[in-house]
């Protein structure tokens, strides 16, 4: 589960508003705990290793009253919050970060053991990819810098006057964008499996990993920081 609050202060009140009350019983099933830990670690690792992405403020596997088994909390940059504008690079980052949980499950437990816990993440990925192609003009080549969707009056977007051929091309590009993001995410997590495992162990032991602990873990493996060259294999799959 992914969340992006607007402030650095992450406290009980904010948690209650965004993800519901913390369950006092915690998580007792060891297998479920490990699964959720790997899922959330996948999101957090992808965010931490994606240049210029939102800061990971908190990762937890403590269940919530709204049904969430755990969540990863982000702090967006002030510039993005103030402007409300997002670059293509940032949106591609959103795709791979959102897929981090599902991909981590597949890597660790195998395709046959992947759960439905990522359903919301997959919907988010599809929605972002659709808007990139049909609304924001980020088509690779077939559609060009054209918006094929318009506001629907309810805060969302509906189809404009696009032909069946154009709709088919939109679907094709959206599907490919999602597939490329999945492949890029898998490459990154496989290359950083030791980091994924260590963060998971921390979550199983502590249940919650905060900003300072997350920074310390990333710094242990990347003392010189995250740079664009390091993530080029993942970026290349999305170009």
Locations of regions flagged by a protein language model:
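Conserved P-loop NTP-binding catalytic core
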Residues: 21
């Amino acid at each position: 589960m992914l969340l992006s609050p607007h402030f650095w202060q992450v406290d009980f009140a904010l948690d209650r508003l965004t993800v519901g009350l913390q369950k006092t019983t915690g998580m007792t099933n060891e297998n479920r705990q490990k699964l959720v830990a790997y899922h959330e670690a996948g999101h957090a690792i992808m965010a931490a290793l994606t240049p210029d992405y939102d800061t990971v403020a908190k990762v937890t596997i403590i269940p919530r009253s709204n049904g969430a088994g755990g969540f990863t909390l982000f702090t967006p940059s002030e510039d993005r919050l103030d402007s409300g504008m997002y670059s293509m690079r940032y949106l591609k980052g959103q795709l791979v970060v959102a897929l981090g949980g599902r991909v981590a499950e597949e890597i660790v437990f195998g395709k046959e053991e992947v759960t439905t816990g990522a359903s919301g993440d997959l919907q988010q990925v599809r929605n972002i990819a659709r808007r990139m192609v049909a609304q924001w003009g980020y088509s690779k080549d077939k559609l060009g810098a054209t918006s094929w969707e318009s506001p629907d009056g309810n805060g969302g977007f509906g189809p404009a006057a696009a032909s069946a051929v154009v709709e088919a091309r939109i679907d094709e590009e959206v599907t490919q964008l999602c597939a490329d993001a999945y492949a890029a995410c898998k490459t990154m997590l496989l290359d950083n499996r030791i980091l994924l495992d260590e963060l998971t162990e921390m979550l199983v032991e502590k249940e919650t990993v905060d900003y300072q602990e997350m920074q310390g873990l990333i710094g242990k493996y990347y003392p010189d920081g995250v740079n664009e060259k390091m993530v080029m294999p993942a970026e290349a799959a999305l170009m």
